[in-house]
């Protein structure tokens, strides 16, 4: 019955809970679901269903993630919760579950802890743009001054990592109490606090720009020459729209070239345009087959540039995940798989880091042997002889 009400006419936003272990992330996820279920805005998912997260494999990395969905009056949300700290690290670095914003859960009884800090840092690094804070376990704090102190600490921590700490919405409450209330079918004082939190999420986390509204980009997968028609490049459009007559650029590996789109085909049919998510063939005017190769991208003119040097945040696969069995050191030269191709690059480790063990996450500097279309937020895999040994995201372009 509840399924019928899920009409996708509301704007869609992806969020997730982050924060230190045992501060109540999963309980809050269950409480949000339970409180909104009393209003008929979602299906009830209990704590155990969320906590026993199925393991998924994303680029060969095992990640346990729970997905729940719910609605507020204004929006439709997909919400991610991870049971273990390592799962968060992997999830955020691989972008397995992209977040438009996050709810940072901090126990009011304990204040910010090491993983609180690490999750905020990761959010900054991997580009989670907005954070709303829930101070959980408010029922365990009798002292209003203590609550204020924790709030100040959290704001300071956010500011340290370049989030607007002073303007960040912070709502206090108790996920457990709200969950207990909701199970009786009522929204009491604790449930109201969860609704207040969701109202802040609605207000503070903007609706993300849809992929089709972003500048056109298509990674080149294959190149063909068609007699009498010219060169066709195929691939899946990552973002934006491409129309017949558009001027586009071919970026990466070699010097950037300009060309004009003379045709767009999908399943052998001629189209006026292709958009994000479509697998298409794009016919290019005056471009020779040998001018284009896998690993380049077709894009809107000036929207992305080729680079060889960048900083990245990476997760190194553990031995159990099929990764390396031994650490790597400064100067390690693996392949970086970006979109559709491998490019060799050398890794410099941060000062004071001697080596990186399988299962670690670390910030690295990379120099590629050929330029690739890159921007902050571009994801990549690190490969060695065709097998994935790490996953990462570009956090800063340096050259």
From Swiss-Prot:
Residues 60-64 are annotated as: G2. InterPro entries: EF-Tu_GTP-bd, EF-Tu_GTPase, EFTu-like_2, EFTU_2, G_TR_CS, P-loop_NTPase, Small_GTP-bd, T_Tr_GTP-bd_dom. Its EC number is 3.6.5.3. PROSITE patterns: G_TR_1, G_TR_2. Residues 10-209 form the tr-type G domain. Residues 19-26 are annotated as: G1. Keywords: Cytoplasm, Elongation factor, GTP-binding, Hydrolase, Magnesium, Metal-binding, Nucleotide-binding, Protein biosynthesis. Pfam families: GTP_EFTU, GTP_EFTU_D2, GTP_EFTU_D3. SUPFAM superfamilies: EF-Tu/eEF-1alpha/eIF2-gamma C-terminal domain (SSF50465), P-loop containing nucleoside triphosphate hydrolases (SSF52540), Translation proteins (SSF50447). GO terms for molecular function: GTP binding; GTPase activity; translation elongation factor activity. GTP hydrolase that promotes the GTP-dependent binding of aminoacyl-tRNA to the A-site of ribosomes during protein biosynthesis. Monomer. HAMAP family: EF_Tu_B. Belongs to the TRAFAC class translation factor GTPase superfamily. Classic translation factor GTPase family. EF-Tu/EF-1A subfamily. This is Elongation factor Tu. The lineage of its organism: Bacteria, Pseudomonadati, Campylobacterota, Epsilonproteobacteria, Campylobacterales. The gene is tuf.
